[in-house]
Amino acid sequence: MFRWYQAKLAKQPILTASVTSAVLFGSGDVLAQQVVDRKGLEKHDFARTGRMALYGGAIFGPAATTWFGFLQRNVVLKNSKATIVARVAADQCLFTPTHLTCFLTSMAIMEGSDPIEKWRNSFLPSYKANLTIWPLVQGVNFSIVPLEYRVLVVNLVSLGWNCLLSMINSGDK
């Protein structure tokens, strides 16, 4: 299975990352609804899961793949440790606020609610939660994970993170 995934990544990296992101964003929402909230299938909000999967596949997968490539090519310092710190800082100060803003506002639009209000209520809790885990994850990711697998690593860690994001987005803080 892993070799098949490697072949797909080599041949179509953005498409592969997008499909992976869609599946894992949707899975994070299923975890939020079924494991955390214990809604059961009869009360499961399938539209919410679909919105999460759509965002993961259409926005996050392509954006993260492009972003990691950009960092790899453009954030290169003389010292490898400084390079990692600079990449993590860029990721947390540039990509993360942009990603969270896109996530929160696009979810609000798809839900038919006010995107500005959603951003005002949810951005800071989401960003604070992000800072508790992602700088460390990305430090490890940028240190030891080859470029082509970085989105996969983020997606695997994101199972729990997307569960949290989905709960914050739904007001289940």
Curated annotation (Swiss-Prot):
GO terms for biological process: ethanol metabolic process. It comes from the Eukaryota. Keywords: Membrane, Mitochondrion, Mitochondrion inner membrane, Transmembrane, Transmembrane helix. Its main location: mitochondrion. The keyword Transmembrane applies. GO terms for cellular component: mitochondrial inner membrane. It is a multi-pass membrane protein. Pfam families: Mpv17_PMP22. The chain crosses the membrane at residues 12-32, 52-72, 129-149, 151-171. It is found in: Mitochondrion inner membrane. May be involved in cellular response to stress. Required to maintain mitochondrial DNA (mtDNA) integrity and stability. Belongs to the peroxisomal membrane protein PXMP2/4 family. This is Protein sym1. It comes from Aspergillus oryzae (strain ATCC 42149 / RIB 40).
